[in-house]
Structures are given as structure tokens and as C-alpha cells.
Design a protein with these regions (language model features):
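ABC ATP-binding cassette signature C-motif
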Residues: 1-108, 191, 195-382
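Coupling and communication elements adjacent to P-loop NTPase active sites across diverse families
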Residues: 1-11, 95-211
């Protein structure tokens, strides 16, 4: 309690801010992403507090388990517009998936009908052109056609064809207007490197040391293709352990084995240091610009953002810059420190599917319980 606020960990700062918010019992709580940096027990505590608050509140969060524990309404800001429904996050998402499946099926049917109408319109246009050509009879036939009769007949045929074509185009536009803009996330790709050694890391009694204190010693082995979650309370030294693995000179006890020639891709917890445009960051890290920008587009970046200074980005956009850069790197080991802080729901799901599909060797810190349960092949608790 005597330490300056700036020296606290991200989760400890979040706890202090929430405590200050809840002290004012007369105010209407408006809470913006309270789970960022907050550990598992802290999230459970805040969720329970809100559930039993006895009055209304407005909450922004992308943590699925947290939302299920404390809300009874969902206001979803979808691409097609806002949607307010009664229920938990899980009930809303199940209904959304059911609706999306139905809309996808209807979209495919409509696209088939549009293709058939376009083909029919093309044939009709051909008839119209053919009718126009009959006005100009060939001179090689040896006959002298009645141009007045043929002109009248072809004009009627052409007018009929044009009317049919207009009706077909109107039907095409009507069908196209029925197509639904369904919220879908593009799949991401990753190219992890295979390590010559099956064992990438091994820690024995490893703990970061602090002035007057020492973290809890941990032991683990991380093999090729495994995904290890470091779990622990705020301030327990998880980030310090990641920095040790990166090779930083941090006072510690115990031993750490790292496979020789280990290539590591690192996503730090904070992204406040980002400056310049995305192209500048790509050049600094020596990663392919086209691939980098493509990944950002798949993570819902607009092209307009590429010309802006990253210092002007939201916290979630800056975090996506770090994640996209990591996904551009081929590495033996991916080291991610709270990668989901400030990240929206659909991007979280994209990242989960990516990790399950490409199975990189990953050591991560993340308090999102759903992400932990889906991704971690082992959990080490501090």
C-alpha cells in the first residue's frame, strides 16, 4: 500500500482503480474493460461483486467467462448495427451462431439465384443484339428483304428483350439487397520453426529475485509443439520469468536450460512504446510489409489506420500491431505476455483457431479462462 502507483504491476493498478470506483456508492458505475491485466481470482472477485451489486452498471468487456458471471443483458455492437438482448454472453453467442448459420445458407441460395438471373440476362441481351442485326439483311442472299416489315418485327423483339432484361436486372438487385452482412473472421496463418532439439526449455527452481523479496520457484519442461501457460496472481513475477527466458539479465535463483540457437518471437504485455506508422514498425523488425498489413486487415484494421501514427491508436489496435508482427515471424518459440489485453472477441477467436491449427511451441501468460482452457497443454502456477 505504500508503493507508488506507477511501480505496481498492470493487474495491481487495475485493482486500485476498481477499488476507487466502487467506493462511490452513489455513482452509476461505467466500467471499461476491467479484466485487462487482472488475474483469475481478481476477475472472479469483480464478477461476483457486480453480480451482487443490486443496481445497474454499464460494462465493456471481451472476457467470455467474466461476462457470463455478472451480466443479464448484452449490447453487441455488430457490423450491421447495435443489438440489445436479455441473457448472458453464452446465450447471446449461441443464438448469434444459429442466426449466422441460417443467414449463410440463405446467402448461398440467393447467390445461386443471382448467378442464374445474370446468365438469363446475358442471354436476353444476346437476343436483343440479334434482333438489331436482322435489320441489316445480308446482300449475299440474292433476295431483297422487306426492310419495313423486318424493322418493325426486330424493333418489337428488341423492345421485348429490353423489358425482360430490365425485369431481370431489377430481380438481381432485389436479391443482392437481401444478402446479409454476416460478421465473419478471416483465418490467420503462422509458420513456426521446427527445433533440432525436442526440448526447448527446462526450468528448475527458477524464480526472479526482487529487492527484499523473491518469487515462488517453478519447474517445468517445454517440448516441441507444447503450449504452456504461466498462471499466477498479479505481481507474482510472471513477466519477469518471461524476460529471463528472453535472456535479460535479471537477478534470479534456480536454473534455466534453453536449446541452442533458439529463435523467439515475443509479444510484450504493454504496447505504449509504439510510435510511427505500421510500415516503420515492419521495417524496424525486418518483417514482410505485405504480410504484416494483410494480417492487420484480417484483424479488422481499416486501411485508413495504416497512414496514422500508432501513438494515436486505441490500446487494442496497438496490441494487434504486436500480435501481427509476431505472426509474421518464423520462430521456434512464441513468448506471449497477456496477448488478449484489449483484444476484441472475434480477434480472440481468430487467434485461438490459429494456435489450434498450426500448433506452435508457445509459452504464454493469459488470465482469460476460456483461452487458457482451449489453448494450454499444460499450466504452471506461480
Amino acid at each position: 500500500l505504500d508503493r507508488p502507483f506507477s511501480t505496481l504491476s498492470g493487474g495491481e493498478q487495475t485493482r486500485a482503480l476498481l477499488a476507487g470506483l466502487f467506493l462511490d456508492e452513489g455513482a452509476y458505475p461505467m466500467i471499461d474493460e476491467p479484466t485487462n491485466h487482472l488475474d483469475g481470482p481478481g476477475r472472479a472477485l469483480v464478477s461476483e461483486y457486480l453480480r451482487n451489486l443490486g443496481r445497474g452498471f454499464l460494462l465493456v468487456s471481451h472476457d467470455r467467462a467474466f461476462l457470463d458471471g455478472c451480466v443479464d443483458h448484452i449490447l453487441a455492437l455488430n457490423h450491421t448495427g447495435p443489438e440489445l438482448v436479455r441473457g448472458t454472453f453464452s446465450s447471446w453467442f449461441r443464438d448469434k451462431e444459429d442466426r449466422d448459420r441460417g443467414e449463410l445458407a440463405r446467402n448461398e441460395k440467393l447467390k445461386g439465384e443471382i448467378r442464374r438471373l445474370e446468365q438469363a440476362a446475358k442471354r436476353t441481351s444476346g437476343w436483343s443484339d440479334k434482333a438489331e442485326k436482322t435489320k441489316h439483311a445480308t446482300r449475299n442472299s440474292g433476295l431483297r428483304p422487306d426492310r419495313g416489315f423486318i424493322g418493325h418485327k426486330s424493333a418489337k423483339m428488341m423492345q421485348r428483350a429490353k423489358n425482360i432484361e430490365r425485369r431481370q436486372q431489377s430481380a438481381i438487385q432485389e436479391k443482392a439487397g437481401l444478402l446479409k452482412d454476416i460478421e465473419r473472421a478471416d483465418s490467420l496463418k503462422l509458420t513456426p520453426l521446427a527445433c533440432h532439439s525436442g526440448r526447448l526449455l527446462e526450468a528448475r527452481g527458477l524464480a526472479a529475485a526482487y529487492p527484499g523479496a523473491e518469487g515462488r520457484p517453478v519447474g517445468f519442461t517445454l517440448n516441441q509443439g507444447e503450449r504452456l501457460c504461466l498462471d499466477g496472481g498479479n505481481g507474482s513475477g510472471k513477466t519477469s520469468l518471461l524476460r529471463l527466458i528472453l535472456g535479460e539479465d535479471i537477478p534470479h535463483t534456480g536454473t534455466l536450460f534453453r536449446a541452442s540457437g533458439l529463435e523467439i518471437s515475443y509479444v510484450p504485455q504493454k504496447a505504449d512504446h509504439l510510435q510511427g506508422k505500421p510500415v516503420d514498425w515492419a521495417e524496424k523488425l525486418d518483417i514482410g510489409l505485405t504480410k504484416f498489413l494483410t494480417i492487420l486487415r484480417k484483424l479488422d484494421f481499416s486501411r485508413e489506420l495504416f497512414s496514422r501514427n500508432m501513438a494515436e491508436y486505441s490500446a487494442g489496435q496497438r496490441k494487434k500491431i504486436l500480435l501481427a508482427a509476431s505472426l509474421c515471424q518464423s520462430a521456434h518459440l512464441y513468448l506471449w505476455d497477456e496477448p488478449l489485453n484489449y483484444i476484441d472477441l472475434f480477434s480472440r477467436m481468430q487467434i485461438e483457431e490459429l494456435l489450434l491449427q498450426y500448433r506452435p511451441t508457445l509459452l504464454f501468460v493469459e488470465h482469460d479462462r476460456v483461452f487458457q482452457e482451449r489453448i494450454a497443454t499444460q499450466v504452471v502456477r506461480l
